[in-house]
Amino acid sequence: GKMVTRSGGFLTSLYDFDAGFFRLSPREALSLDPQQRLALELAWEALEQAGIAADQLTDTAGRSVGVFLGISSIDHWQQQLARSPEAIDAYLATGSTHSVAAGRVSYMLGVSGPSLAVDTACSSSLVAVHLACQSLRQRECEIALAGGVNRIITPTASINFSKAHMLSADGRCRTFDQAASGFGRAEGGGMVALKRLSDAIASGDRIQAVILGSAVNHNGRSNGITAPSKTAQQAVIQQALSASRLSPHQVDYVETHGTGTALGDPIEVGALGAVFGEQNRDHPLVLGAVKTNLGHAEAAAGMAGLIKAVLAMQHRQIPANLHLSEPNSGIDWASLPFQLPPTTMPWPTAEGLPTAGVSAFGFNGTNAHVVLQAASPADSQSPPPPNQPPPNLADTRYLLPLSARTPTALTQLVARYAQHLAAYPDVSLAEVCFTASVGRSHFAHRLAILATTPTALRQALIDVLAGRPNPACISRHDVGTGSPNEAVNKDVAGQLSLTHWANRYIQGENLDWPTFFQQCFPEKRYQKQALPTYPFQREYYGP
């Protein structure tokens, strides 16, 4: 009845949540699985990172959005069922079941595309990505949110894994190391917004990477229900490469499943060797293992690997595999064209688009592999517009609209934007304002700032935080949100000043931002930028 370790990669503030933002009562929030809470926050942040306004995704807008959520832990469900009958409330089932975790995201957004909870254990989130891609190809949805979550609430699973000799004694993953003896459990979550590439290009979206292909299979009958299968792993990687129309030598990097177990590591390297083992490669295939950095996030593990691979391609740098002292002697490394990164290293080739594979294998026998490629500059970039007044506006300034559900959240959002502009002083002001306008939902507490340069905008934000007057700022007000109306569109066509437009925003009008930019900047095509996300106001909702 004991665990071999209490160490792991744990998140703080298990029960903290912004119930008000998601329109949940305190009573319902108390019964909500922390995994459901995390999924809601991740979905909102994924949309904001993509520059997609969540309030424009409702069914009335005619846009189909799918939700594919990897989720496996039943800690909260077990905890709720252990309560006395008198303590059971009306929210036990909806707050605990995995099906509702995905459904709640769809409900929150008001969308009616496919909504699936995926439980294939450690491969859940990567299987969710595979299913999301299939749904997009079949045109079941225009946008797909895919991800995974994992929170550890009780010691039950850790005791089970300890008795099954799965966990390392110090809670660390030593992937591919001679001392590998098990994995360390971890909490976490991640979610990505997916579109068909042609749609993302047409929308001027910020394309982070392109999924070329994916595959899913099962071990079938192997040495045991939880035992990995070299044959099945080899097959799923080959299927994903075939779906991507790539040859093995075109892949630069593989983010492995890499749990750091004495059984699993040699089997995985054996499968990789069977696919990528040709010695005539132009450069070694680098094998990464994010579990050495974060631990094993179980249902969210595949998402951690995918996000790491995307970031590595963007920065053209591969992070080190930690806890790697001596490569596993049970693996014939000399016969394989593989490289383990003991320190951060540059991307192995400077030519062509970086290409990577990501693996995730569930202990139920379900395997997944996804092949990614860095976004082409032609797809992901557009020439930055000059910081000069467009010819059809009376003002020479750009308008930044900011809003939040509460005054405190608005102040924190202002601070985040000021920090962002300090970190990226050469950012295109026009594209910042474009993204903040069309790529965000707009709430009751509002602020509008008019500026001609990023420096001037940052100074105005600093003045707002300090309580100093600045003529560039249109005072914030507590307003109700209205509906788009013909008067607003007429004002745009009439080329009224940005000050007038800002005042309408502050007064609570639900403005038609795409029409504004289309009519005021008809010859310009803006690229959505990475901007700060919403500052959730979390409070404690727990036992």
Regions found by a protein language model. Give the residues of each.
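Short acidic, Pro/Gly- and aromatic-enriched capping/linker segments at domain boundaries
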Residues: 522-531
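Condensing-enzyme catalytic core of the thiolase-fold
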Residues: 1-391
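Residue-level marker of motif borders
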Residues: 114, 252, 360, 401, ...
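Flexible lysine-rich "adenylation lid" loop at the C-terminal edge of ANL adenylation domains
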Residues: 531-533, 539-543
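Flexible catalytic loop/linker elements that gate and position reactive groups at enzyme active sites
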Residues: 228-243, 355-510, 537-540
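Helix-rich "cap/lid" substructures immediately adjacent to catalytic or cofactor-binding pockets
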Residues: 99-102, 499-507, 516, 520-521
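Acidic/polar, glycine-anchored loop/turn motif associated with catalytic or activation segments
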Residues: 43, 501, 513
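Short coil/turn segments at secondary-structure boundaries
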Residues: 3-5, 56-60, 429-434, 473-476, ...
